[in-house]
Structures are given as C-alpha cells and as structure tokens.
Amino acid sequence: EVLQTNEISVNELQTARQLSRLLDGFYNTTAWQAITRKLILDDNDFLRRFLEFLIDKNLIDQPMSLEKRGLVLYEFCSMHYPAYKIMVTIAWIEAGMSLKKKPAEKVKTKRQMPPEYWEVIYGNYKESLRLCFLPIDDNTQNGYWFGFESEIQKAEPVFKAKEIMERCQNTQSPQINTDKSS
C-alpha cells in the first residue's frame, strides 16, 4: 500500500523504497559495503545511476544472493566506473566468492610464487598457503596477493599483501630480500 501526502508523492515514496532496497543489498552488506561507500562518496550521481541500472535490469525488487549482488556491482562498474572494478574484485575475493567467475577473471591462481617484497595487509604468510595474485593493471607487476588455507578448504583468504617493487623503510612486515647481489 502506498500513500501520498502533501510532503511526498507516490513516485518519491517508490524511489525511497527502492533506495532502501539498494542500500540494504549493497551498503548494509559487509562484503560490498566498502566499495559501495567509496562510490557514494566519490560520485554524487552514483546512487541515482546504480538505482536506474537495477531498475532497468528488473533487479531492484528481486532477492539476490551475495554472489549475484557482486556480479551486478561488477557489471555496473565495468560499464560506468571501470577504475573501481579492482575494488569490486578485491571485495569478491575477500567474501570467498568463486575465483572462476567474471569479477575474478584477472586473478592468477596457477603455481603462484611469492614476490621478492610485499607489504602484509593482514594474516601471516606460510608456505602451505595457496597463493593467488591480482594485478592492479595490465602494465605492471604490482598487485595484491591472497593466501588461502588449502587443507581446511576455507573460501575466504587468510592472508593479504600488496606487492611492492622495492623494500621501503615504512612498510609493515615486508618480506626481506635475501639476495646479496642487489
């Protein structure tokens, strides 16, 4: 039931309800909160554009799984905010979503070896971790490393690091270069 008052029209009530669904599905969901917050803060038009996208795709009133919301957000960013795709991919990986789906298409999973230097963001590296690498772009070797516990089959990474090209004085827990020739 929709009521109209002198203060708000039926269309405005509909928009408020749809914005509430958008925020519940993306902002109030831990997996997508940081990227949604960043997009809201960085672009005043984001909420309007994303809401229009969800309405056009007939998704605003559909229940969506965590994975479906990630796929939708990735598709939207691919079309309208390509610079933010990397953040959606990081959120996708950290939420334990499949590394075989589109948001993780650039993730390298086969026989990944740790780099010479990295800055640990969380967790502790150990050789038993299965490493995956997400390059930040196609032109550099810089990117994010994620470590997964193979023996317990945990979907979420237990380790995350950012590759750095050379050792810096102010990094937290970098891997030390043991090569004497450098």
Model-derived regions: residue spans:
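A structural motif corresponding to the C-terminal lobe/cap of the Radical SAM core domain
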Residues: 1-42
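Short, low-complexity, charge-dense intrinsically disordered segments
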Residues: 170-182
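Extended hydrophobic/Leu-rich segments
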Residues: 13, 19, 54, 60, ...
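An accessory alpha-helical subdomain
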Residues: 31-79
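Hydrophobic, aromatic-lined core segments that form the binding pocket/scaffold
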Residues: 63-118
